[in-house]
């Protein structure tokens, strides 16, 4: 069951908890440090890949102008128009991201086949994020450290070891959180974008006419004259917009206005000035295509620039890693993933979490990518395909929102879909040529994560149906208590359950084995709403039944942290006070047994049982004191 009190708006604003405490300029600076790290490090490798990659575009004036025009209009169409102007208006109580967008789309669709497909799309888009999250740190840090080769070729053997040291250090430090250094991310990235702009302007002086590349006719002519080369080039041009989808995912931290201000006032101009500078440099010295970004840097400043670029890529990688932690928590809350150990790394910022299992999975994959691909150019072949797929999914989900939730007219909504989906498909089709060169990796990771998420969701549904079919109705149970009442003992017993109208198995087992009931018996259900946060005033519902029995329903948003003792503390306002020292929590611990005809293929059934056995403790996940927990085992045929 979901809480139906949320309000969807067209036009996301900064969350009240942050937007009213900080000025919009301060939030914009903070957003630059988190939201734009990924796209902000794209100049390190984008044009190098275009003119020096496996499908290298020949260097001549028409081609350089055409590519720069493509980059500009990709940034305008995909990032500026689609994400900054349109999709960021689709906020779910101030929150963004593909989970929030999926929730908005499902809210206006009747249950059925269409809703199922939208749900599948949303989950697949979320799964693709993990593949992207593995490649981003690897390609970003590698491309930064490769600047040492520009300073002197003698550093070439040390690039991989240095990159690995940086990356391993980054993941090892996750346990400590970023609270102590997070405040400097914004100012550091502001400096980074200012440096990008200055380097770009310096390069533009070599060929001032390069500014004419803003004319879309250059891009059109490039495609008309060389359609195949133009199409293949899109597979590298897409690197300029990777990370654009992140600005919507992080909207909940800063709000729409600061993200929009940061993009149009600094990030977009700085990025494109740098691309123009690199283009001018390539026209002036075609040999510079081997690393046009670092060739823009004066010789005396190459080493400091490598240091600054490495710091910028660390910040960009941190945003992706934190995003993976946050997405995992949302998946757990929404019932798509088993419980995992989740640690808070800050006493002040509730959103700063650390998920050890995800952290080490990402580290292992990142190290394998760096060792396996050896260079940022090789990694570029694996990059982009997952991002473009995610962007296509965002467009489809956004179309449902603008048509059904915002009530746009059919013509206007279809125009939105056709324009942006055409651009997305063009980029995606161009990246498909990378599949055998490395693009298979994020697709494989995405497919694997998607399978895990859907298997867990389906398995939990089947398990709940099985338990439900064997559950005794609560009213019949209470009537039997009147006929032959068992002894009552002091205190309160809390039984967590999925159905408040049935008797939890743990309650029956306790009664059968211990022959007693507590003075107060509380049946507690936890619901996750399709909104990011549920206000404290709407956290709990209490219903007194009879014979000392109570029903308590606790509501959380998909970005809230479940804390059952804290929630029960709110029940006093509803006439049901709790004393934790007099309260025992009875949790059922099921042992699953496979059977024929369970409703899932045998391999998925075995996978679900494996996931179930390794799921984290319910007591830990719900912050229940271990010394107040009683676990009662039961066997269930799946």
Curated annotation (Swiss-Prot):
PANTHER family: LOW AFFINITY POTASSIUM TRANSPORT SYSTEM PROTEIN KUP, OSMOTIC STRESS POTASSIUM TRANSPORTER. Residues 1-20 are annotated as: Disordered. Transport of potassium into the cell. Likely operates as a K(+):H(+) symporter. Keywords: Cell inner membrane, Cell membrane, Ion transport, Membrane, Potassium, Potassium transport, Symport, Transmembrane, Transmembrane helix, Transport. Belongs to the HAK/KUP transporter (TC 2.A.72) family. The keyword Cell membrane applies. It comes from the Bacteria. It is a multi-pass membrane protein. GO terms for molecular function: potassium ion transmembrane transporter activity; symporter activity. It catalyses: K(+)(in) + H(+)(in) = K(+)(out) + H(+)(out). It is found in: Cell inner membrane. GO terms for cellular component: plasma membrane. The chain crosses the membrane at residues 24-44, 67-87, 115-135, 153-173, 181-201, 228-248, 263-283, 301-321, 353-373, 382-402, 413-433, 435-455. Disulfide bonds: none annotated. The gene is kup. The lineage of its organism: Bacteria, Pseudomonadati, Pseudomonadota, Betaproteobacteria, Rhodocyclales. This is Probable potassium transport system protein Kup. InterPro entries: K+_transporter, K_trans_C, K_trans_N, Kup. It comes from Azoarcus sp. (strain BH72). Pfam families: K_trans, K_trans_C.
């Amino acid at each position: 069951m979901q809480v139906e009190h949320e309000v969807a708006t067209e036009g996301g604003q900064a969350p009240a908890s942050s937007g009213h405490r900080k000025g919009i300029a301060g939030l914009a600076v903070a957003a630059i440090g988190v939201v734009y790290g990924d796209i902000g490090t794209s100049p390190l490798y984008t044009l190098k890949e275009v003119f020096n990659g496996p499908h290298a575009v020949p260097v001549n004036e028409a081609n350089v102008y055409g590519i720069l025009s493509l980059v500009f209009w990709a940034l305008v169409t995909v990032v500026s128009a689609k994400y900054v102007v349109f999709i960021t208006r689709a906020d779910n109580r101030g929150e963004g991201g593909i989970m929030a967008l999926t929730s908005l789309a499902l809210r206006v669709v009747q249950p059925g086949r269409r809703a199922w497909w939208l749900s599948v799309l949303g989950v697949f888009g979320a799964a693709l994020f993990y593949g992207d999250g593995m490649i981003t740190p690897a390609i970003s840090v590698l491309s930064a450290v490769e600047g040492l080769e520009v300073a002197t070729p003698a550093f070439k053997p040390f690039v991989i070891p240095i990159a690995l040291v940086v990356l391993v250090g980054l993941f090892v430090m996750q346990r400590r959180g970023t609270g102590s250094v997070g405040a400097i991310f914004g100012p550091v990235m502001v400096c980074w974008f200012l440096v990008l702009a200055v380097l770009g302007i310096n390069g533009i002086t070599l060929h001032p006419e390069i500014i004419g590349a803003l004319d879309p006719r250059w891009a059109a002519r490039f495609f008309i004259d060389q359609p195949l080369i133009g199409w293949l080039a899109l597979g590298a041009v897409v690197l300029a917009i990777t990370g654009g989808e992140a600005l919507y995912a992080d909207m909940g931290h800063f709000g729409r206005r600061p993200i929009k201000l940061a993009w149009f006032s600094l990030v977009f101009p700085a990025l494109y000035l740098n691309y123009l500078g690199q283009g001018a440099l390539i026209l002036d010295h075609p040999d510079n295509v081997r690393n046009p970004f670092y060739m823009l840097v004066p010789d005396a400043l190459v080493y400091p620039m490598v240091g600054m670029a490495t710091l910028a890529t660390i910040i960009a990688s941190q945003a992706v890693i934190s995003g993976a932690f946050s997405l995992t928590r949302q998946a757990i809350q929404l019932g798509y993933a088993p419980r995992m150990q989740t640690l808070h790394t800050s006493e002040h910022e509730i959103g700063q979490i650390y998920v050890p299992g995800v952290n080490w999975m990402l580290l292992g994959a990142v190290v394998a990518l760096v060792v396996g691909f050896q260079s940022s150019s090789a990694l570029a072949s694996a990059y982009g395909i997952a991002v473009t797929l995610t962007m296509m999914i965002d467009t489809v989900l956004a179309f449902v929102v603008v048509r059904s939730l915002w009530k746009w007219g059919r013509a206007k909504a279809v125009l939105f879909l056709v324009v942006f989906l055409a651009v997305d498909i063009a980029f995606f089709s161009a990246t498909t040529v990378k599949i055998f060169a490395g693009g298979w990796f994020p697709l494989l990771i995405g497919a694997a994560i998607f399978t895990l998420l859907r298997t867990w969701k389906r398995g939990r549904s089947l398990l709940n149906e099985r338990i439900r079919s064997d559950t005794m109705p609560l009213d019949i149970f209470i009537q039997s208590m009147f006929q032959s009442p068992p002894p009552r003992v002091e205190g309160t017993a809390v039984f967590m359950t999925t159905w408040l109208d049935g008797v939890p198995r743990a309650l029956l087992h306790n009664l059968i084995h211990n022959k007693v009931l507590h003075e107060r018996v509380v049946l507690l259900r936890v619901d996750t709403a399709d909104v990011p946060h549920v206000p404290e005033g709407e956290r709990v519902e209490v219903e007194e039944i009879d014979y000392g029995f109570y029903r308590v329903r606790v509501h959380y948003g998909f970005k809230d942290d479940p804390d059952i003792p804290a929630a029960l503390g709110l029940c006093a306002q509803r006439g049901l006070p709790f004393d934790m020292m007099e309260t025992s929590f009875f949790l059922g611990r099921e042992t699953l047994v496979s059977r024929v005809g369970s409703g899932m293929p045998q391999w998925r059934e075995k996978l679900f049982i494996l996931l179930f056995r390794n799921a984290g403790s319910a007591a830990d996940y719900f912050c229940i004191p271990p010394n107040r927990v009683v676990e009662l085992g039961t066997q269930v045929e799946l």
